Regions:
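Active-site-proximal loop/hinge segments that shape catalytic or ion-binding/gating pockets
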Residues: 237
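Short, active-site-adjacent cap segments at secondary-structure transitions
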Residues: 17-18, 240-242
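Nucleotide phosphate-binding/pyrophosphate-handling subdomain across enzymes
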Residues: 58-179
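Acidic, Mg2+-coordinating active-site environments of NTP-dependent enzymes
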Residues: 1-69, 87-106
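C-terminal helical cap/extension that packs against the catalytic core
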Residues: 11-33, 126-129, 135, 170-231
């Protein structure tokens, strides 16, 4: 991917990963622009109230340039990192003579849509659909739910592939959700069995869990047992998120 004389921009901060990027860029003779020295940001979390999103905001600094504060349509501090990287790319393109007006930047950041990425449905309870399928994304999910959503009972509807770091994800979820319902994707050939997930859960948490392999029944049960002032979070795999998104209108009021 890294090509000679083509700028490389990254907000990766993991030392091992960044070292590989730096070494590869140096060998290719590609200029590297990276955080935190050349790309940094301040994040003001958004908030969801009564099903309405109050946008998060990012204030980015790239190439020694201070950008205006922009609203973001996507929730989570990781999206502020992504937006800052976008702004760094915009700067590079502008330096090459490509005209990108500030209004276009503002519109793009405020109107980006990414299905099943902290996607919010309903009001009582709120339903949050996400694709977290490893420990790192599970941690970001929990942190964002804690910072941007109302306080209240939280239910997890979870299905995942057998080859994922399931115990690592459970370590992030264990202290956050009051109860968990395990199900599985109909279309994933690697979907873990709900009863196996429940067994693993019992090893890391004393909180109650339930198993229902039929997704439609699991969805109905999760909604019925989540209080109106609560949050139902559905996550674990792209397969599961896609299936839930297709059936969700059947369970929510028009």
């Amino acid at each position: 991917i890294i090509k000679p004389a083509v700028p490389v921009l990254t907000t990766v901060e993991h030392p091992e990963a960044l070292n590989v990027i730096m070494e590869t860029a140096e060998k290719a003779g590609a200029r590297l622009v990276c955080s935190p020295d050349q790309i940094s940001w301040r994040y003001n979390p958004g908030e969801v109230k009564l099903g309405t999103l109050l946008p998060s905001k990012v204030k980015a600094f790239t190439h020694g340039r201070e950008w205006p504060e922009f609203e973001l349509s996507l929730l989570g501090p990781h999206q502020a990192s992504n937006a800052s990287l976008v702004l760094a790319c915009v700067h590079e393109l502008q330096q090459q003579g490509i005209a990108i007006p500030q209004e276009a930047i503002k519109y793009g950041l405020a109107n980006t849509q990414w299905l099943a990425r902290m996607e919010v449905f309903g009001k009582s309870p709120l339903v949050v659909l996400d694709c977290a399928h490893n420990r790192a994304s599970a941690k970001v999910l929990v942190n964002t739910l804690g910072s941007s959503f109302p306080k209240g009972p939280k239910t997890l509807l979870f299905g995942v592939s057998v080859d994922k770091d399931i115990k690592g994800m459970f370590a992030e979820f264990g202290q956050f959700f009051e109860k968990v319902l395990f199900t599985q994707s109909l279309y994933s050939p690697r979907a873990a069995k709900p009863e196996d997930l429940a067994h693993l859960w019992s090893q890391v948490s004393q909180k109650p869990s339930y198993s229902e392999p039929i997704l439609e029944k699991a969805m109905a049960m999760a909604l019925e047992t989540t209080p109106p002032d609560g949050i139902l979070c559905v996550t674990g795999s792209v397969f599961l998120a896609g299936e839930v998104r297709s059936i969700l209108p059947n369970y929510l009021p028009v």
